[in-house]
Every structure is written in C-alpha cells, then in structure tokens.
C-alpha cells in the first residue's frame, strides 16, 4: 500500500515537473523510463489527493510511534541483494516489495540510512536506520556505533 501511494505521489511530481521538460526537449529515453513516464501522465488529481491524505496520516502515525530522539532499525529489503543477470520481470516484482520497505523515508521526510550489515546464504542483507525529522547528522554519527 505505501509503495502504491509513493508511486502516485512521485508520478504526480513527474507529471508536473518532468513531463513538460521532456515534451519540450524530446530527449532519448529508455523503454523502462518511458513506461514510467506514461504511467505518471495518467495519474489523476483525485489519486494524488488520496495519496496525500495517506501520507499525512502516515506522518502522524510515525510521529507518535517514533518520536524525536528514537531511531527505528529494520531490514532494508524483504530479501537479499538481487542476483546479477536477473530478468526484468523478476526485478520488477522485487522492486515493488523493496519499495514497500524503503518508501517510508520519502513519504515521511525522515532520513534513512541503509547499510549491508548482514549476510544470508544468498548474499548481503541491508539494515536500515530511520531517524526523526532533520536528524540526518545524528543518524550518520550513529553508524560509528554499529
């Protein structure tokens, strides 16, 4: 759910700020990016309004659950690093799962640091630290303690 709302808000920004530049300059764009541009061009104001409501509710919830001075630690992804040469379809499915874990920082304007701290049988597994608003420097300093 969070990844879907993030996609809508990001797509809305692309529609407002990037698509006019693309239409004016006609740059060469990869098929994958072009597909995302087309998706963004179809986002409606109602979808953006609903996504903004979700975002505001999420910010309120995170402010209560993770007040100033606290740091959340959680897995960066629900799986280890993708394998080299993995096909686009598999990567696309993995990307949505990944976005459900990493889009909280973009949705709440909080700093997040991800580090490859752990390892499982298939490769490195990242952990993320999520801080409170404007705690970027403090979060970076916490890395020395890990």
What feature does the model see in each segment?
Residues 81-99:
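Short, surface-exposed loop/helix-turn segments at secondary-structure junctions
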Residues 93-115:
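Small-aliphatic-rich amphipathic alpha-helix that forms the alpha element of a beta-alpha
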């Amino acid at each position: 759910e969070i990844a879907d709302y993030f996609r809508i808000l990001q797509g809305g920004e692309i529609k407002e700020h990037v698509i006019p530049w693309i239409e004016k300059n006609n740059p060469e764009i990869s098929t994958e990016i072009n597909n995302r541009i087309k998706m963004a061009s179809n986002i409606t104001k109602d979808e953006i309004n609903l996504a903004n409501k979700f975002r505001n509710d999420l910010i309120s919830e995170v402010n209560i659950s993770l007040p100033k001075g606290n740091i959340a630690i959680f897995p960066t992804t629900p799986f280890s690093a993708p394998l080299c040469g993995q096909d686009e379809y598999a990567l696309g499915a993995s990307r949505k799962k990944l976005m459900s874990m990493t889009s909280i920082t973009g949705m709440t304007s909080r700093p997040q640091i991800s580090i490859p701290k752990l390892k499982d049988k298939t490769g490195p597994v990242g952990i993320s630290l999520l801080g409170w608003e404007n705690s970027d420097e403090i979060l970076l300093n916490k890395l020395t303690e890990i």
